[in-house]
Amino acid sequence: MNAPLASGRPDIQSADGIWHCCHLLPDADPDRAVRDAALVVEQGRIAWLGAEAELPADYRSLPRHDAGGTWMTPGLVDCHTHLVYGGQRADEFAMRLAGASYEEIARAGGGIVSSVRATRAADEDTLFSQAAARLAPLLAEGVTAIEIKSGYGLELEAERRQLRVARRLGEAFGVSVHTTFLGAHALPPEYAGRADDYIDLVCNTMLPALAEEGLVDAVDAFCESVGFSLAQTERVFEAAARHGLRVKLHAEQLSNLGGAALAARHHALSADHLEHLDEAGVEAMAAAGTVAVLLPGAYYFLRDTNLPPIALLRKHGVPIAISTDHNPGTSPVTSLLLMMNMACTLFRLTVPEALAGVTTHAARALGAPDRHGKLAVGRAADFVLWRVESPAELAYWFGRNPAAVVVRQGRIHPATSQHGGRA
């Protein structure tokens, strides 16, 4: 049996068998690339990979999938998104073009609080259908694992709806979803002037309930002058620790409050944004093993001019991840490949750094380096076949999706198997 690439057969679902006639990049290290390679999938997991000429005899009778000379990489990992929310905020785009700052939009009643109103008003099915439409292009581009935050409810029931929708998306689309509780995202209107009281609600009511329901994989906060203070953020981190949950942090996006160092003290999975990060913060992250998650979409959309300290991150050996930061206000982007290009062009990352940023390092930012971001025997079959001459093209093109086939959790993504990457 030979299952050709893009065969047009809608009944192709299982990825079990031999994937051959491909070139293999098992992780982001170009020195580990294998030309004329093969990969064997059994019961949805990788059973063998290497040069096709060395394929063990025991596997040679398995069904075959002709990869057509494509490049195979691990599935991509989008490690920072706000995918579930109500409505959109195109009106704020016009305000920003007219010169309004992030802080000015927030103080005028826009920003996060605007999305809070729309999210609170939406039922679960509405949130699901809207989020599914945003997820589709990411999946078609090869995303096989994604983090989804709450943070647009800012009350227990609305936060619960967001996290339940995130779980539903994973089940419905066969994608690995890692949920993050971001109750400390902004101050809801009913708590105006009472930030400490709201943090009480986050730590003592919302987080315990949502953790008990199994809806939370990690906990995040927005540590900024328009968000929450270091002391308030630390309270959230301490509450997370009581529930055995790892933390991450929106830090040093608009100013340097020392959030990255605080995150490192709590052994955070990641500190994200980091445009105003200083060397002390970099050193703290390096010592703690905290991943730096760069979000070039927000940098571009906000027309920022303060670059993250790439040279310092390299100097101190801090792993660098890249993500879409998909959200309605500052990064309404649904292309992780575009973020790779922007990370290279705007932040001057190398192509191998960009590839690591959406595979191995992004998996580490999720606390799942043993599950995502690398092709290895025993792992779930999450991989992408790309119609490119070299993996460098993944960061080179923008406005084009070269994905030919996406396999998630051992299943062939039907849209890409039939239509060459278009959802």
Swiss-Prot record:
4-imidazolone-5-propanoate binds at R89, Y152, H185, Q253, T330. Its EC number is 3.5.2.7. Its cofactor is Zn(2+); Fe(3+). Zn(2+) binds at H80, H82, H250, D325. It catalyses: 4-imidazolone-5-propanoate + H2O = N-formimidoyl-L-glutamate. SUPFAM superfamilies: Composite domain of metallo-dependent hydrolases (SSF51338), Metallo-dependent hydrolases (SSF51556). GO terms for cellular component: cytoplasm. The keyword Transmembrane helix does not apply. Pathway: Amino-acid degradation; L-histidine degradation into L-glutamate; N-formimidoyl-L-glutamate from L-histidine: step 3/3. GO terms for biological process: L-histidine catabolic process to glutamate and formamide; L-histidine catabolic process to glutamate and formate. Fe(3+) binds at H80, H82, H250, D325. Binds 1 zinc or iron ion per subunit. Signal peptide: none annotated. It is found in: Cytoplasm. One of its GO terms (molecular function) is imidazolonepropionase activity. N-formimidoyl-L-glutamate binds at Y152, N327, G329. Catalyzes the hydrolytic cleavage of the carbon-nitrogen bond in imidazolone-5-propanoate to yield N-formimidoyl-L-glutamate. It is the third step in the universal histidine degradation pathway. HAMAP family: HutI. PANTHER family: IMIDAZOLONEPROPIONASE, IMIDAZOLONEPROPIONASE-RELATED. NCBIfam families: hutI. This is Imidazolonepropionase. It comes from Cupriavidus pinatubonensis (strain JMP 134 / LMG 1197) (Cupriavidus necator (strain JMP 134)). The lineage of its organism: Bacteria, Pseudomonadati, Pseudomonadota, Betaproteobacteria, Burkholderiales.
